[in-house]
């Protein structure tokens, strides 16, 4: 079914996206305000 496939893709991508945002924010926090990105 298409719904099952889409739900599986969403459930797989959401944790990866949240982890990526968390890691990016953590790295920027560690660097401080030295680099203005």
From Swiss-Prot:
Keyword line: Chloroplast, Electron transport, Membrane, Photosynthesis, Plastid, Thylakoid, Transmembrane, Transmembrane helix, Transport
GO cellular component: chloroplast thylakoid membrane; cytochrome b6f complex
Primary location group: plastid
A biological-process GO annotation: photosynthesis
Disulfide bonds: none
Pfam families, sorted: PetG (PF02529)
InterPro entries: Cyt_6/f_cplx_su5, Cyt_6/f_cplx_su5_sf
Keyword Cell wall biogenesis/degradation: no
Membrane topology: Single-pass membrane protein
Keyword Transmembrane helix belongs to the record: yes
Family classification: Belongs to the PetG family.
Protein name in the entry: Cytochrome b6-f complex subunit 5
Organism, as annotated: Gnetum parvifolium (Small-leaved jointfir)
């Amino acid at each position: 079914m298409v719904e099952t496939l889409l739900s599986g893709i969403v459930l797989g991508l959401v944790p990866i996206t949240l982890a990526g945002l968390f890691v990016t924010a953590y790295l920027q926090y560690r660097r401080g305000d030295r680099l203005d990105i």
